[in-house]
A protein has these predicted regions:
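Negatively charged, low-complexity tracts enriched in Asp/Glu with abundant Ser/Thr
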Residues: 2-28, 79-83
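Serine/threonine-rich, low-complexity intrinsically disordered segments
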Residues: 8-11, 47, 58, 85
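Acidic, low-complexity, intrinsically disordered interaction modules
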Residues: 23-79
Length: 87
């Protein structure tokens, strides 16, 4: 794993495994930290941001995190296209 996942249950790791692997293959570094109180996760997308404590994304639960990882990969690969508005 290029990044790291901190304080996550085995079931949670299994939920995000495919999208996490795809994210790492497209972007490289990721660090996911479970919040102290609650069900959320902080996502850091570079070592510098992690060292500074400057998270990139807050995901309020494991399903949101899984969807966020999926969306990043879809956007990186041009799967989602912007609306072409004609004027």
């Amino acid at each position: 794993m290029k990044g790291m996942v901190i304080s996550m249950t085995q079931k949670q790791k299994e939920i995000i495994a495919d999208n996490l692997r795809a994210y790492e293959n497209n972007f490289g570094y990721i660090k996911i930290v479970k919040e102290d109180y609650g069900k959320g996760f902080y996502v850091f997308t570079s070592e510098e941001r992690a060292e500074q404590g400057s998270w990139t994304q807050y995901c309020y639960n494991i399903d949101y995190l899984n969807g966020w990882l999926y969306g990043c990969v879809q956007a990186a690969n041009g799967i989602m296209k912007k609306i072409d508005r004609e004027e």
